UniProtKB/Swiss-Prot annotation:
Source lineage: Bacteria, Pseudomonadati, Pseudomonadota, Gammaproteobacteria, Pseudomonadales
Transmembrane annotation, as ranges: none
PROSITE patterns membership: DHODEHASE_1
Cofactor binding annotation: Binds 1 FMN per subunit.
List of residues binding FMN: 61-65, 85, 138, 171, 216, 244, 267, 296, 317-318
Organism in which the protein naturally occurs: Pseudomonas fluorescens (strain ATCC BAA-477 / NRRL B-23932 / Pf-5)
Database matches in InterPro entries: Aldolase_TIM (IPR013785), DHO_dehydrogenase (IPR050074), Dihydroorotate_DH_1_2 (IPR012135), Dihydroorotate_DH_2 (IPR005719), Dihydroorotate_DH_cat (IPR005720), Dihydroorotate_DH_CS (IPR001295)
This protein's name: Dihydroorotate dehydrogenase (quinone)
C-alpha cells in the first residue's frame, strides 16, 4: 500500500509531497486511523536517560518541525517522536526549491534552513496532542541571531519547551544555518553546554523534574574532534548524544541528478559515516552517556548495526520516506532478534 502511495507522492515536488504527507499523517492521527493502516511493532520497552521508551525506534527531528502530526506518527508505531527543529521566532527558511530526492541512492539533500512557525506555535500543537509517550523537542537558533549570541536562542527555547518535553535536543549540527556547526568545537561548545547545564539545573528546581538534554552532532568531524565532543559532553553533564545529522559529503551521489545541490545529504549514503561516528563515541563514552543513532537506516538490519556499534536507540528519517511505516516494525524486529 505504501509503495502505491509513494509512487503518487513522488510525482509531486519533494516539499509539496512532504507537506501533504504530514497533513495526511496528522489527520489519520486525529481520527485514530493510522494504527489500522499498518501492523504495529512488537512491544520492546527500553529505558534510556531515565525515560521509558515503548521501543527503541524513533522519528528523527525534521519531518515534523512544528509538531503538527505527533499523534499520527506515534500511531504508526514509533517508540518515541522528536519534533522540531524549532527556533524562538518563526522564520521562513531558505528559498525554494530546497529539498531534492535522489532515489537511485535512497538519499535526500535538503537546505531547509530551520523553517518553522516558532516555539510558541509548536507548544500549542504539543498541548493539543493526545500522545503520552516520549516526546523530544529539538531546538535551534534563528537565522539572524549572530552565532556568538546563539546561546541566548537556545536558552529561550529551553525555558519554553522544558515543561512539555520528555527530552530536549540541542541542534548544533545543521549545515544549513551559517556558522552553526562552529558551535560543535572547542570553547564555543563548552560554553554553550555549560550555559545549558546551568539552566537545566535551574529549571529542574522550578519544575520539580529533570528533563534530559541531548546534543545532535555532525558526521563530518574527524575522530579526534568527535572524541573532544564526547569529553565535553561528559564534563558538562549532558544526558545523551545524537549521531548524526546530515553530511556535507557527496560520496555516493556523485554524478546523480541533484547530487551537486547545496545542503545536507541524508539517507543511505550517510550510513557508514554515521555508524563510524557512533563507534568512535561509544569507545570514548564507554557506557557513561547513551547514544541515539540516526543516519542511513533503510532496512531493519541497519538499525541493528547501529545498536551493535554502541547506540541505545535509533531514529528514522529518509529511510521512512523511502520505505514507509513498515520500516519501523522491521527495525524493531531486527533489534529484538539481536537477543
Amino acid at each position: 500500500m505504501y509503495t502505491l502511495a509513494r509512487q503518487l507522492l513522488f510525482k509531486l515536488s519533494p516539499e509539496t509531497s512532504h507537506d501533504l504527507s504530514l497533513d495526511l499523517i496528522g489527520a489519520g492521527g486525529r481520527l485514530g486511523l493510522n494504527g489500522l493502516l499498518c501492523k504495529a511493532p512488537a512491544q520492546m520497552p527500553v529505558k534510556v536517560m531515565g525515560l521509558e521508551f515503548a521501543n527503541p525506534v524513533g522519528l528523527a527531528a525534521g519531518l515534523d518541525k512544528n509538531g503538527a502530526a505527533i499523534d499520527g506518527f506515534a500511531q504508526l508505531g514509533f517508540g518515541f517522536v522528536e519534533i522540531g527543529t524549532v527556533t524562538p521566532r518563526p522564520q521562513p527558511g531558505n528559498p525554494k526549491p530546497r529539498i531534492f530526492r535522489l532515489p537511485q541512492a535512497e538519499a535526500i539533500i535538503n537546505r531547509m534552513g530551520f523553517n518553522n512557525l516558532g516555539v510558541d506555535n509548536l507548544l500549542a500543537r504539543v498541548a493539543a496532542s493526545q500522545y503520552k509517550g516520549v516526546l523530544g523537542i529539538n531546538i535551534g537558533k534563528n537565522f539572524d541571531t549572530p552565532v556568538e549570541r546563539a546561546v541566548d536562542d537556545y536558552l529561550i527555547c529551553l525555558d519554553k519547551v522544558y515543561a512539555h518535553a520528555s527530552y530536549v535536543t540541542v541542534n548544533v549540527s545543521s549545515p544549513n544555518t551559517p556558522g552553526l556547526r562552529s558551535l560543535q568545537f572547542g570553547e564555543s561548545l563548552k560554553q554553550l553546554l555549560a550555559a545549558l547545564s546551568q539552566r537545566q539545573q535551574e529549571l529542574t528546581a522550578i519544575h520539580g523534574k529533570r528533563v534530559p538534554l541531548a546534543i545532535k552532532i555532525a558526521p563530518d568531524m574527524s575522530d579526534e574532534e568527535t572524541v573532544e565532543v564526547a569529553r565535553a559532553l561528559l564534563e558538562t553533564g549532558m544526558d545523551a548524544v545524537i549521531a548524526t545529522n546530515t553530511t556535507l559529503s557527496r560520496e555516493g551521489v556523485e554524478g546523480l541528478e541533484h547530487g551537486a545541490e547545496a545542503g545536507g545529504l541524508s539517507g543511505a549514503p550517510v550510513r557508514e559515516k554515521s555508524t563510524h561516528t557512533v563507534k568512535v563515541l561509544a569507545a570514548e563514552l564507554a557506557g557513561r552517556l547513551p547514544i541515539i543513532a540516526v543516519g542511513g537506516i533503510t532496512e531493519g538490519k541497519h538499525a541493528a548495526e547501529k545498536i551493535a556499534a554502541g547506540a541505545s536507540l535509533v531514529q528514522l528519517y529518509s529511510g521512512f520516506i523511502y520505505k514507509g511505516p513498515a520500516l519501523i516494525r522491521e527495525s524493531v524486529d531486527a533489534i529484538a532478534a539481536m537477543g
